[in-house]
Amino acid sequence: MKMNLPPFIELYRALIATPSISATDSALDQSNHTLINLLAGWFGDLGFHVEVQPVPGTLNKFNMLARIGEGKGGLLLAGHTDTVPFDDGRWTRDPFTLTEHDNKLYGLGTADMKGFFAFILDALRDIDPTKLTKPLYVLATADEETTMAGAKYFSESTQIRPDCAIIGEPTSLQPVRAHKGHMSNAIRIQGQSGHSSDPSRGVNAIELMHEAISHLLVLRNTLQERYHNPIFHIPYPTMNLGHIHGGDAANRICGCCELHMDIRPLPGITLNDLDGLLSEALEPVSQRWPGRLTISELHPPIPGYECPPDHRLVSVVEKLLGTKTEIVNYCTEAPFIQTLCPTLVLGPGSIEQAHQPDEYIDTKFIKPTRELISQVIHHFCHH
């Protein structure tokens, strides 16, 4: 059966050659169905039980869960199938053709992160499934780069409860055990426009926004005082007021003003908590000016994530790699997978290459990544 599997570089080539862009712009957004079917075929050839799941609320997007071995617990290896769009003018190579040059493999998704599936498949050639005493799961998700709809749906709907999970995002093989979340909102104030010669005939949205901002700055201080986690370089939740637009002329009362802001919560603060704090902070403005203030999401929010430092997954991986776990500033699917089991983010390639023109992975990662995957499968599925 394993003889059917193409060589490592051909697996990689086929993954990169199968476009799977996710984008908020529907003109650029693509289904990942072809890629999911490709993966499903390969894992099926290796004797895995494969399930392909449509992701509700998406346009033709799918998750794949492959399982081999029986029983409870085990290990989940996870990754996303989608890539960001590419800027044609800034790429010097074809994004969908795997190109090797100067010990680098170039292509869209080489580092972030379709290539991870080639590493998993390659490592599985040498593993005898009859020797597994616990199940090995491989999860391929949709839309990580936009809404994280695939990971969210999977974590809410699956029955599996592995002992632990590894998400193969490009961390240069440095294990990551925590990151903050991200929530971005638009605060919109609807005033009443009119000529500036008679202020009493209008409601100035800029003045109301000034009031709203003063309440937001109080909330910013509250977040800083109330929440603290020393593992982070900035040990409290941050708030940034990033963009504001209102009015159209000096001699007109401003009829509408909109502020875009973000909050980066620590692990342990739920998205519901944050929504509540934001609404509560702006409630005095809403009460004074009924119906004039609205809060909306700019992007789907992501909670913070932390894997307990004393979990066996952390000690095993730190020992295998001879390095300590790290904390990072970017967001991943880990908060959703962490609801099922302790999760680390750990994979080949550098985050510096993600979302860049001429994206690549250094070939120096090939051997250690293959070894690491074999070792963690052996450790968590053979005992």
From Swiss-Prot:
InterPro entries cross-referenced by the UniProt entry: AcOrn-deacetyl, ArgE/DapE_CS, Bact_exopeptidase_dim_dom, Peptidase_M20, Peptidase_M20_dimer, Peptidase_M20A
EC class of the enzyme, as a word: hydrolase
Compartment(s) where it occurs, according to its Swiss-Prot or TrEMBL record: Cytoplasm
Keyword Nucleotide-binding: no
Any one GO cellular component localisation term in the record: cytoplasm
Pathway, per record: Amino-acid biosynthesis; L-arginine biosynthesis; L-ornithine from N(2)-acetyl-L-ornithine (linear): step 1/1
Gene Ontology BP annotations: L-arginine biosynthetic process
Entry EC number(s): 3.5.1.16
Transmembrane segment boundaries: none
Cofactor: how bound: Binds 2 Zn(2+) or Co(2+) ions per subunit.
UniProt entry tagged with the keyword ATP-binding: no
Residues holding Zn(2+) 1: 80, 112, 169
GO molecular function: acetylornithine deacetylase activity; zinc ion binding
CC cofactor: Zn(2+); Co(2+); glutathione
Catalysed conversion reaction: N(2)-acetyl-L-ornithine + H2O = L-ornithine + acetate
Residues involved in Zn(2+) 2 binding: 112, 145, 355
Coiled-coil segments: none
Alphabetical UniProt keywords: Amino-acid biosynthesis, Arginine biosynthesis, Cobalt, Cytoplasm, Hydrolase, Metal-binding, Zinc
Function per UniProt: Catalyzes the hydrolysis of the amide bond of N(2)-acetylated L-amino acids. Cleaves the acetyl group from N-acetyl-L-ornithine to form L-ornithine, an intermediate in L-arginine biosynthesis pathway, and a branchpoint in the synthesis of polyamines.
Family as reported in the entry's similarity comment: Belongs to the peptidase M20A family. ArgE subfamily.
Assembly with partners or alone: Homodimer.
Name used for this protein in its record: Acetylornithine deacetylase
Taxonomic placement: Bacteria, Pseudomonadati, Pseudomonadota, Gammaproteobacteria, Enterobacterales
Gene responsible for this protein: argE
